From Swiss-Prot:
Example GO molecular function: C-X-C chemokine binding
Subcellular location: Secreted
UniProt organism field: Ixodes ricinus
Glycosylation sites: N44, N91
UniProt name for this protein: Evasin P1229
Phylogenetic classification of the source organism: Eukaryota, Metazoa, Ecdysozoa, Arthropoda, Chelicerata
Basic and acidic residues biased stretches: 99-108
Amino acid sequence: MEVRTFAFLQIVVFVALGIQLFAAVTDAADADDEFFTVDYCGMNCTLQQDGSWTPCTQKNAECKCYHESGSSVGLCLSTAYTDFNQFGDPNNSDLDAATPRHPDASSR
């Protein structure tokens, strides 16, 4: 009796794991339309005595100071988020219609 109960519980756990894995893979497949990048700017930032942080001066002010709460040292990071859903389908016929044509191509 105990063996059957244990086997049943193992099957339940494997089924639950399979469902979770399927959900994770499906969610990851949908994430192709979004792209988030973080780049280290090559410098750190520190908390000054007046409560302000030293500026991150790399990459034309694209870098910002990111720090954990309670910490007096942070990292200068550059972040970028791209949502590829904002761009149209590259196979859209409107793109072909809007493509510039060479002036001689219309006379042929």
